[in-house]
Amino acid sequence: MGSRSSTRIPVPLMLTVRIMLALSCVCPTSSLDGRPLAAAGIVVTGDKAVNIYTSSQTGSIIIKLLPNMPKDKEACAKAPLEAYNRTLTTLLTPLGDSIRRIQESVTTSGGGKQGRLIGAIIGGVALGVATAAQITAASALIQANQNAANILRLKESIAATNEAVHEVTDGLSQLAVAVGKMQQFVNDQFNKTAQELDCIKITQQVGVELNLYLTELTTVFGPQITSPALTQLTIQALYNLAGGNMDYLLTKLGVGNNQLSSLIGSGLITGNPILYDSQTQLLGIQVTLPSVGNLNNMRATYLETLSVSTTKGFASALVPKVVTQVGSVIEELDTSYCIETDLDLYCTRIVTFPMSPGIYSCLSGNTSACMYSKTEGALTTPYMTLKGSVIANCKMTTCRCADPPGIISQNYGEAVSLIDRQSCNILSLDGITLRLSGEFDATYQKNISIQDSQVIVTGNLDISTELGNVNNSISNALDKLEESNSKLDKVNVKLTSTSALITYIFLTVISLVCGILSLVLACYLMYKQKAQQKTLLWLGNNTLDQMRATTKM
């Protein structure tokens, strides 16, 4: 059966590819429009590109601490170099010992491997407590053990070279770059100049430069006396050690210039010491940086709320701090899995939450759907700058314009005031003077009022007050109920017994029957009386007619 080749993609990378493919099917997004929201106290402060980073890639940088002097100048620089060499050994020997203890704690036998590793870590940590980060750093140090051993095999050739930067590839499993900040100085100052320098000047120049570099080394490794091998080095520390030569390694690892500044600010580029050789004064550091995937159709929009005026007092809008928009979909973005820089978000995973229809409608520009909470105090800063203009609550503070002079008043019912250079060039707020350079064009909505129905109670103190009012209402109701019970208690219970009720019902029925019979009898008697009256009237009329007839005869 023939062999079958297969390509296995790491799960995080597959997740990244799927997300990017899914988002590529959605129409490109536009930034959340903050113009209709500004007058409602909701300010869009900026956008950041969303990136997802997965498993890290590594490379080694071998720092050559001791420079090689030109043959004709070795004698002049001998004294400062020897003093520098002794100081280096004193400073970095604890680091080398710590690295060796951790690397030697793990052998090929499986039984007590983990126990020996933890024991070695705790042995090099103050107070005998190993953090998760230190255990992770120790594990990375163990994984780099073979690479460090391969570098040490080449230490003589690395130490002998006069090149400031060169790649080391022989027998190494990952990219390694040997750099020498001091070698760069020697090459620039002595090897590439035709100017003859006297021995005293050479000694002074070398001594000063070596002292400066020792200061940088002390800054990098000084705070790590307790566990020097287990503390990560920041990108700033790496640049202090390697100088500008650090860029060479990062470029070789695939970091572009457009990405470099953002990654440096993120703190995702770190280093861990993996070897120190006092004989050749070589320091090996494994540099770790992330694999970054850019989500082209996704950006994070940051929202800030301003305390606005309402008929119920000062309130702030209930909206998420960060939202993301892809096409027509707007959702809240959880940034707890992300690292922020000035322009980018680097996330290990993308987590969003759907918003209620009211908040969605609010952020889409329907400010009448926005809800507000009475949680902002009177000491909250009542203004915010936006693109050279100011959004201020001029009911909470005095908006004094110095050019042209005057007081900017806020109309009754208006949430906030939008102030730009068209209305004021120099604005004073709480003693702070601002020169305005921006404008709110006609697309910005103004004179927005917050209705009473839009203000709800969410703060602890306000809820306590409302609960107090509810408790008072309940107490009043209980008082009324108690008063009613006292009146009911005065009722004769004997009159409300079952037998008494039956008697009352029976007598009531008899009374009703008697009443009906009396009514029928009365009607009959009235009818009979009227009949008798008609008979008597007829007899009278008949007798009168007979008398008239007799008289005529």
Curated annotation (Swiss-Prot):
Pfam families: Fusion_gly. Its main location: virion. It is found in: Virion membrane; Host cell membrane. It is a single-pass type I membrane protein; Single-pass membrane protein. The chain crosses the membrane at residues 501-521. Residues 1-31 form the signal peptide. Homotrimer of disulfide-linked F1-F2. This is Fusion glycoprotein F0.
